[in-house]
Regions:
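Short, charged surface segments at domain edges that flank catalytic/cofactor-binding sites
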Residues: 5-49
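Histidine-centered nuclease catalytic patch
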Residues: 50-82, 92-97
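A recognition module on extended beta-rich or small alphabeta surfaces enriched in W/G with H and D/E
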Residues: 87-88
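Long, mid-chain structured domain cores
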Residues: 1-3
């Protein structure tokens, strides 16, 4: 009936708003995706070149090239591997380190 259809439309619009929100984008960052990006980037920081091969205990993080806070999405082409030092200094700036 029309009431159910209207409720469904409201439900879908809320889901779309969430998926575009910062929280929605961060929720898309799964451990599987993090691992995939690190493997793609050969476990190497795209900024300074530090790698776990040279520094076995190096903390690597996945960074949004265009920050979520500036409209960036959690997609493979907007993600890169950075060491913790480079990621902290980058913050939410848009810096192309590739």
């Amino acid at each position: 009936d029309i009431d159910n259809l209207n409720r469904f439309v409201v439900y879908l619009s809320e889901k779309i708003k969430f998926s575009k929100s910062v929280a929605g984008q961060r929720a898309l960052m799964t451990s599987k995706l993090r691992q995939h990006i690190k493997e793609r980037d050969h476990f190497t920081c795209k900024c300074c070149g530090a790698s776990i091969e040279a520094e076995p205990h190096l903390l690597l993080e996945i960074d949004h090239i265009i920050p979520v806070s500036k409209g960036g999405l959690t997609t493979e082409d907007n993600l890169q591997t950075l060491c913790w030092r480079c990621n902290r200094s980058k913050g939410n700036k848009v810096v192309d380190v590739q």
